[in-house]
């Protein structure tokens, strides 16, 4: 009888320990986003801003449609436009790191150069908003980078996120709003979790013109809009 009680007690202890460890793992290793979950959601992400000619109009559309987005900023541009950065933040959007200079040859010259660029961009956000973030997007994405560059970012404690859909506003010069909409609609290929790449750098008026249609399409498809 005593042995049975001991065995039961040990099993209960082991179960509790496993649950505790699993909970710790979930907390420490929570992904930026996860695919394969049941609810459909979309993350609108804007790179290369802020700009005077695009970002305020993007913000107007987002406000009108009642959705939030994530802005991967260029530090050099943010230094010149702190009021736009403050507006993005006050509107409830996420502000995260893209690059300080966005000069590929310069920032990808070495791991040290890349980290210096990231830290400079982070410092700009902190100086304007008092905001610290560890979320980053490689200019051009991480897909074709040397592994040592990706590794150095992870070792420095930054999380990075790419995208799995794009409106292709940086790929197709002069693309019409309808072309951008079709790309944003078709490239996700029925994914339940969509990280959509758009740009709010200078002279992206067609991106602004396509945005409302993109948002309304995904609302009709039952997607929830989230920030990273």
Region annotations inferred by a language model:
Residues 1-44, 60-69, 191-228:
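Terminal accessory/targeting
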Residues 11, 15, 60, 79, ...:
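Alpha-helix termini
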Residues 12-18, 38-43, 73-79, 135-142, ...:
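Short, mixed-charge, low-aromatic patches
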Residues 23-109, 113, 117-127, 131-132, ...:
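Active-site beta->alpha N-cap acidic-glycine motif
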Residues 102-197, 201-219, 223-224, 228:
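Catalytic domains of cell-wall/extracellular-matrix polysaccharide-remodeling enzymes
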